[in-house]
Swiss-Prot record:
The keyword Phosphoprotein does not apply. Seems to be required for the assembly of the CotSA protein in spores. GO terms for biological process: sporulation resulting in formation of a cellular spore. Keywords: Sporulation. It is found in: Spore coat. The gene is cotS. SUPFAM superfamilies: Protein kinase-like (PK-like). This is Spore coat protein S. It comes from Bacillus subtilis (strain 168). Belongs to the CotS family.
Length: 351
């Protein structure tokens, strides 16, 4: 009881910094280190969000949110405090206040919705340009760090292969080892290909215009309003190439389908390209990132570190089989970039 009263007192104090009359407050969500309260005010319903992160990091995100809002991206308005701050916080906890927006759920299996999402991603990347964080904020950047990231993931994969070999009777480990050598080889080839690509050139261009990525581009952050995607919140961002978001989105879609659908990929990339055109050399960087076995590495990471404590062995085994199916079926397009690049541009022109 004391903890609940203490929490209510903190929330009340946080809300007192905003220029609204508060009618009612109710805890709406509490998961993954984040709490969300629905707040009824004299200016309509709001959402107060608490995150376990330093205020300097939250400031980097909330100022980016305001930047996107100023650029006209469809995004829930973020509110400033009476003193003009975009967030509040102490030590490791931060708070921000947004308008509550409601719309139609967006799903990965809806082809037309996904095309709209890819188009939205293009608008997002355009709107992100020119963002310069303040000195008080703590920025996050992966620009120029792909080589290091790839090497780290490959080292972890090799380590997980050794762990798997020590559990010969474990079903997950048996399946993992059957495919690990191929995934390791493909990852090493992607690392080599990165050296021969225009990754460094694209990185320098991105550094100059200051664009950022969503980092965790998931449909849970979006809703559909009047037939178009609308961003409910900016969960996390990082300075990086826009292709990072494309890789994450495409992988998420294909995992839902349990197989890589090359024709669908072309249609999705064409929708993005119509808003944010990429050169063939830039698509080559995306192809390299898609070739790297991010999905296979991720499920191994989760299993051997026991990150999903609520998952059963059956769920882990199903997830592994699904990741393998998607990773293996990528062979159908990875060596066809020139042909598929032309298809993406032609599809874009035809639609």
């Amino acid at each position: 009881m004391y903890q609940k009263e203490h929490e209510e007192q903190i929330v009340s104090e946080i809300l007192s910094y905003y220029p609204f009359h508060i009618d009612h407050v109710a805890l709406k969500s509490n998961k993954s280190g984040r709490k969300i309260w629905e707040v009824e005010t004299d200016h309509g319903p709001k959402l107060l969000k608490e995150a376990q992160m330093k205020p300097e990091r939250m400031l980097f995100i909330t100022q980016a949110h305001a930047h996107l809002q100023e650029k006209g991206l469809p995004i829930a308005p973020i509110h400033q405090t009476k003193n003009g701050g975009s967030c509040l916080g102490t030590d490791q906890v931060s708070y921000s206040l947004y308008d509550k927006v409601t719309g139609k759920e967006m799903i990965y299996y809806d082809a037309e919705q996904m095309k709209k999402v890819m188009s939205f991603a293009g608008h997002f990347h355009h709107a992100s340009k020119g963002y310069v964080c303040t000195d008080e904020s703590k920025k996050r950047s992966r620009l120029g760090k792909w080589h290091k990231l790839y090497r780290w993931k490959l080292q972890e994969l090799e380590g997980n292969m050794q762990i798997a070999a020590s559990y010969p009777d474990d079903v997950f480990s048996q399946t993992f080892l059957k495919h690990a050598d191929k995934m390791l080889a493909r990852g090493k080839e992607a690392l080599r290909a990165l050296d021969d690509s225009e990754y460094e050139t694209w990185t320098k261009e991105t550094l100059e215009h200051g664009g950022f990525c969503f980092q965790d581009f998931t449909l849970a952050r979006l809703t559909e309003i009047e037939g178009e995607p609308f961003l409910k919140e900016l969960h996390s961002i990082t300075y990086d190439l826009p292709s990072r978001d494309l890789r994450i989105l495409l992988n998420k879609v294909m995992v839902k389908l349990s197989v890589w659908d090359t024709d669908f990929m072309v249609a999705l990339l064409a929708a993005y390209d119509a808003v944010y055109p990429l050169t063939e050399k830039q698509y080559e960087v995306l192809w390299i990132d898609l070739a790297f076995p991010h999905l296979f590495c991720a499920i191994g990471h989760k299993y051997y570190l026991k990150q999903k404590k609520t998952w059963s062995d059956e769920k882990y085994n199903w997830a592994l089989q699904n990741m393998i199916s998607v990773e293996e079926s990528k062979d159908s397009f990875l060596d066809k970039l020139p042909e598929l690049y032309k298809k993406i541009k032609a599809y874009r022109e035809a639609n």
